[in-house]
Amino acid sequence: CAAPGGKSTELGAKLNGSGLLVTNDISNSRAKALLKNVEVFGIPNVYVVSEDPKNIQPGFNEFFDKILIDAPCSGEGMFRKDNKLIKSWEKTGPEFYAKIQRDIILTGADMLKPGGKMLYSTCTFSKLEDEETVRHLLINRPDMHLIDIKHYDGFSSGFTYDDELKNMHLEKTVRIFPHKMEGEGHFIALFEKKSDGETPFKGHGIIHKQKNTK
């Protein structure tokens, strides 16, 4: 859900012309709006993509030092803002989106370099899309682990409703409820990939060696 571009333009501004920002929205029509907005904001170091993450991963394996996943979700946290989302939820509920999210989060972990950080975010209350998706990642990618998120007034810890989630430290995830702070409902989880002690950005290492041989 990179479009329409609010998060991408904010990240691009923080990069201040350094590095590379790759932003992806699988919807072609939404990606066009995304492209227009990053152009309007004058971000020079951005690469806009409209593709299934699985098709991107081979070209960016362990490439990124930071990844933001604003996952497609059932939107339960947005019902108060947009009643139309209730009808959409009735057609495609949490089960539909959980499968998509699990594919995306695993692919994201594969594109993260060792020592890198990845933020997973939804705007839903569903445990299936939130805590259970985090569980799925931690079981299938043991090199990933949760790290603390700074709490602000109104933040609540994620649910730890069984021993496995407690052992995985799901209390480090954050739930945001609209009755506790201004805004809509959200869930966020911050991960770090264990470092193997080697240069993770393989492409950078190759370029560096080539420069030294000249």
Predicted features, each with a name:
Residues 2-214:
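S-adenosylmethionine
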